[in-house]
Curated annotation (Swiss-Prot):
Belongs to the intron maturase 2 family. MatK subfamily. The keyword tRNA processing applies. Usually encoded in the trnK tRNA gene intron. Probably assists in splicing its own and other chloroplast group II introns. InterPro entries: Domain_X (IPR024937), Maturase_MatK (IPR002866), Maturase_MatK_N (IPR024942). Pfam families: Intron_maturas2, MatK_N. PANTHER family: MATURASE K. This is Maturase K. The keyword Chloroplast applies. The gene is matK. GO terms for biological process: mRNA processing; RNA splicing; tRNA processing. GO terms for cellular component: chloroplast. The lineage of its organism: Eukaryota, Viridiplantae, Streptophyta, Embryophyta, Tracheophyta.
């Protein structure tokens, strides 16, 4: 890869990036073929490859020549099912072409990242920064937007995005042909879209990451100007010299027939967080500045990505401060005003600070609705057996129920009023017992007698909830007064999948109307 990077630099790739000759270098496909054989480009099994599968670079070059002719009737993926994005068997040649195309496209992107100003954007690249973001930015923001970058992207949008990065048109022809070949499937033909990250290949992961990079780059100019300090609503300050720096960022507008002054910030404070395809933008500022930022983000994004031709565009709507759905679960929020009085030395100055305190609450009713939707209980909250899991082993059933409870408790560990979670625990434990009883065609009492009463205590033990806390001995007394966000929250379970399906269905219904 270093050799290809040097090749791009010698040709002044930052200004005129001619990458098409790289497609006909055998070293490129040697690297891509090794990636394909090692399974590093995909998480799918490679059982369809035979040991005597001879790879010919001449065949690959012929495929590149066919792509150059822009004949969309050519079947590039000869061994694929009607839907290439499904679990199908791809030939080694088509995989090598995709790997080679990915390696070529990564060259200008890596060179651009060295010169781009995005390197100055110091962000927290961890999912665990979401909860500090909610605690610090939610209470002090005037406008909170919940944006959704769809996984379904039109091929032409990706091609036009890469056109800003790659100067030579022949390099874009293979990309356009491959994208439209993937689009021409029975499921994607009506919508004319391409589902990017559903298949865990290096090619589609690169396309998705690059598309997200371009979406976030339009925020860089605003984020660079915005202040990252915590916003507090202050009372008017007296004229004192040691507040000169703070007063520089404040403008005084006096009203007629009023002795009060309105204190406004010059620049709005913009905070951004993303998890998967969903992102949250929090803006702090005046009503006019917030309105300008909203129009800037929406209109500039549409013009930048030509989103008027995309049926499933980037969806953005105002998010209430009383709820949040990131990352996947549902969280209710209660804002409590907090008054703080500060005093300087010798009692020369006293200032009253008014701020909001972020108090997350466990939403019991929505969680019960999700449990009822997934057939763990009925609509009234009465536990029922999970019939779809009766064909699993006893250990798998216990582990699945235990994982759901552990993820729920860890996610809401930083919330107040966690007593309602024990009702959820009771529903899950009894549903687990009924599932095992239904599997063995017996009763709950017989299952407990055969498997042992300690079996459910190990899976749903009360002590393990505080095993990771440094003060486990005093956790029971301090659990209601302290918030601790656990670090193993990004786990996949049926509740998160069900919640995401509900949200995606609501968004699709909005566009279909």
């Amino acid at each position: 890869m270093d050799e290809f990077h040097r090749y791009g630099k010698e040709d002044n790739s930052r200004q005129q990036c001619f990458l098409y000759p790289l497609f006909f270098q055998e070293d490129l496909y040697a690297i891509s073929h090794d990636h394909y054989l090692d399974g590093s480009s995909s998480s799918e099994p490679m059982e369809h490859l035979s040991s005597n599968d001879q790879f010919s670079f001449l065949t690959v070059k012929r495929l590149i020549g066919q792509i150059r002719q822009q004949n969309h009737s050519i079947v590039l993926f000869v061994n694929c099912a009607p839907n290439p994005l499904a679990d199908c068997k791809k030939s080694s040649y088509s995989e090598s072409v995709l790997e080679g195309l990915t390696l070529v496209l990564e060259v200008p992107f890596s060179i651009r990242s060295k010169y781009s100003g995005m390197n100055e954007w110091k962000s927290f690249r961890s999912i665990h920064s979401i909860f500090p973001f909610l605690e610090d930015k939610f209470p002090h923001s005037n406008y909170i937007s919940d944006a959704r970058i769809p996984y379904s992207i039109h091929p032409e949008i990706l091609v036009r995005t890469f056109r800003r990065l790659i100067r030579d048109a022949p390099s874009l022809h293979p990309l356009r042909s491959v994208l439209y070949e993937y689009r021409n499937s029975p499921e994607n033909l009506q919508r004319s879209i391409i589902v990017v990250p559903r298949v865990n290949t290096r090619f589609f992961l690169f396309l998705w990451n690059y598309y997200v990079y371009e979406c976030e780059s339009i925020l860089f100019s605003l984020l660079k100007r915005s202040s990252h300090s915590r916003s507090l609503s202050h009372r008017p300050f007296p004229q004192r010299t040691h507040f000169h720096r703070k007063i520089k960022h404040i403008i005084i507008f006096s009203r007629r027939n009023s002795l009060k002054s309105i204190w406004l910030l010059k620049d709005p404070k913009i905070h951004y967080v993303r998890y998967g395809e969903r992102s949250i933008i929090a803006i702090k500022g005046t009503h006019l500045l917030v309105k300008k930022c909203r129009y800037y983000l929406l209109l500039f994004r549409q013009c930048y990505f030509h989103l008027w031709s995309e049926p499933y565009r980037v969806c953005s709507h105002q998010l209430s401060k009383n709820c949040s759905s990131s990352p996947g679960y549902f969280l209710r929020v209660r804002m409590n005003p907090l008054f703080v009085r500060t005093k300087m030395l010798d009692e020369l100055f006293i200032a009253d600070l008014i701020t909001n305190e972020f108090d997350p609450i466990v939403p019991i009713v929505p969680i019960l609705g999700l449990l009822a939707r997934e057939k763990f209980c009925d609509v009234s909250g009465r536990p029922i057996s999970k019939l779809s899991w009766t064909n699993l082993t006893d250990d798998d059933i216990l582990n699945r129920f235990d994982q759901i409870w552990r993820n729920l408790f860890h996610y809401y560990s930083g919330s107040f009023g966690r007593d309602g979670l024990y009702r959820i625990k009771y529903i899950l434990s009894l549903s687990c017992a009924k599932t095992l009883a239904c599997k063995h065609k017996s009763t709950i009492r017989v299952v407990r007698k055969e498997l042992g009463p300690e079996l459910f205590q190990k899976s749903f033990s009360k002590e393990r909830e505080f095993d990771s806390l440094p003060f486990s001995s005093k956790a029971a007394a301090r659990s209601q007064r302290e918030r601790i966000w656990h670090s193993d929250i990004p786990q996949i379970n049926p509740l998160v999948n069900s919640w995401q399906k509900i949200q995606d269905l609501k968004i699709e219904n909005l566009f279909d109307q």
